[in-house]
Amino acid sequence: MIISTTSQLEGRPIAEYLGVVSSESVQGINFVRDFFTRFRDFFGGRSQTLESALREAREQATEELKARARQLQADAVVGVDFEISMPSVQGGMVVVFATGTAVRLK
């Protein structure tokens, strides 16, 4: 399954647009680690905890996007966009939304 942020795939013409597919992934951030994240952010360092949670959420959202595209018998998802939300800094949560267009290739 090809996942692309572009609307076209070089050398792979699109035969049919099958519709919009979307997914989301919510990752909790360990409350104790979150304290250290805020401490590190205050001093300008990188937060491994937050980066790890974001990476895992993005990977899960991508896998779910692929699964939904497969249900439509798609070969690829184009125009993929990821949005990241942290609905509650106090709650220690990160949400990744992924959307794209499922397509069948020639």
UniProtKB/Swiss-Prot annotation:
Pfam families per UniProt = YbjQ_1
Organism (species): Pseudomonas putida (strain ATCC 700007 / DSM 6899 / JCM 31910 / BCRC 17059 / LMG 24140 / F1)
Q: What is this protein called?
A: UPF0145 protein Pput_2816
Sequence similarity: Belongs to the UPF0145 family.
Entry's InterPro entries? UPF0145_dom_sf (IPR035439), UPF0145_YbjQ-like (IPR002765)
Q: Which PANTHER family match?
A: UPF0145 PROTEIN YBJQ (PTHR34068:SF1)
Q: Coiled coil: which residue ranges?
A: none
> Known SUPFAM superfamilies for this protein?
YbjQ-like
